[in-house]
Amino acid sequence: MSIKSDRWIRRMAEQHGMIEPFEPGQVRHAGEERIVSYGTSSYGYDVRCADEFKIFTNINSSIVDPKAFDARSFVDVKSDVCIIPPNSFALARTVEYFRIPRSVLTICLGKSTYARCGIIVNVTPLEPEWEGHVTLEFSNTTPLPAKIYANEGVAQMLFLESDEVCETSYKDRGGKYQGQVGVTLPKT
């Protein structure tokens, strides 16, 4: 497997719709204000967080069960910022919609700006031929409330191309998160 460059990312986004909307360069300012950067980097793509958040609360549940997850465990927030309670987490989604090629596996890593503040971003790999908005999980590992900014960079996608096309893609096996839009809760 080889990691793909900015040239490849740009070509795949512009000619094949791999990332929509797509930013061909790095954006570091909104007007006069400095922001957490997003867009194409040397060997990756920095994604933005949309303004839709689901903030975890334990008001309605006594246990978290991925097989029987209670949607009431979240409070929905639509805002330019999300305040995550201490030692809690929130879900969000990318602004960008992805269409992953059949020969590519995409890995998501959190941006150091957030990691250095104790805010961890977790996303599972984007498998070959998966498409949709990426659901992002932000963990606040600190004893203080933590802030996430919508429409700014939150994580970096790395694209790895295999030497051989997979026999069965995510689309082929009818993956449960195929085509997801918005923030998507756990499914079994």
Swiss-Prot record:
EC category name: hydrolase
Catalytic reaction list: dCTP + H2O + H(+) = dUTP + NH4(+)
Active site: E137 (proton donor/acceptor)
Annotated function: Catalyzes the deamination of dCTP to dUTP.
InterPro entries: dCTP_deaminase, dUTPase-like_sf, dUTPase_trimeric
One of the record's GO molecular function terms: nucleotide binding
Domain of life of the source: Bacteria
Protein's GO biological process: dUMP biosynthetic process; dUTP biosynthetic process; nucleobase-containing small molecule interconversion
UniProt record similarity statement: Belongs to the dCTP deaminase family.
Pfam families: DCD (PF22769)
Subunit and partners: Homotrimer.
Pathway membership: Pyrimidine metabolism; dUMP biosynthesis; dUMP from dCTP (dUTP route): step 1/2
Keywords of the record: Hydrolase, Nucleotide metabolism, Nucleotide-binding
Protein name: dCTP deaminase
EC id: 3.5.4.13
Binding site for dCTP: K111, S112, T113, Y114, A115, R116, T135, L136, E137, Q156, Y170, Q180
